[in-house]
């Protein structure tokens, strides 16, 4: 509603999630309908900072959660699960680099992209064989640094205001980092909602270990998509 006029109407069955910014609200009836239909409903500040999420009744699969906790308490099993997530992240990064190399070969330094792709490819068997969480995090960091080294070259338009130099957070120092932080906030909300909808505990992760107030498993799930 804007000035008591309906701007648009959307059937709930066509929506997967709703994100409300600024001072726009939601009626109790809408929140209840979203919870009943497992439609994620999140509220963010005018600057895009995540504030709260409305969720329906948590799934009551206690056996699944017990298994999740047992795996999280076992370093070797935690490493195996975390390794699959990091493998997916590096694999996706490699093919993002390859796609840019294929589609925009005339606009980039192809030799740099080829070198980064080869470096990411070389990390994959190391990740698959790794049995230490700390070493996995180190390999993930190497892969991220390689990907970020060509990320600015993948931005092909609007470079005068939209560019990447280095990752910055709290606060992001440029438009690109602001977009990354904003997108990660929305993605974290979607991942946490998806985990809760199948009965998993979003706060107990494998790569990201326990930290009060942090949805560690949601952050784990995000890795392949970052």
Ranges and model annotations:
Residues 1-5:
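Conserved small/polar residues in nucleotide/adenosyl-binding loops
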Residues 6-12:
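Short, basic/hydrophobic alpha-helical segments
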Residues 9, 63-226:
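Active-site helix-to-loop segments that bind/position phosphate- or nucleotide-bearing substrates
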Residues 14, 21-95:
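A surface-exposed, charged beta-strand/loop segment in the N-terminal or early-internal portion
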Residues 16-22, 173-177:
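Conserved interaction-surface patches within small, structured recognition/assembly domains
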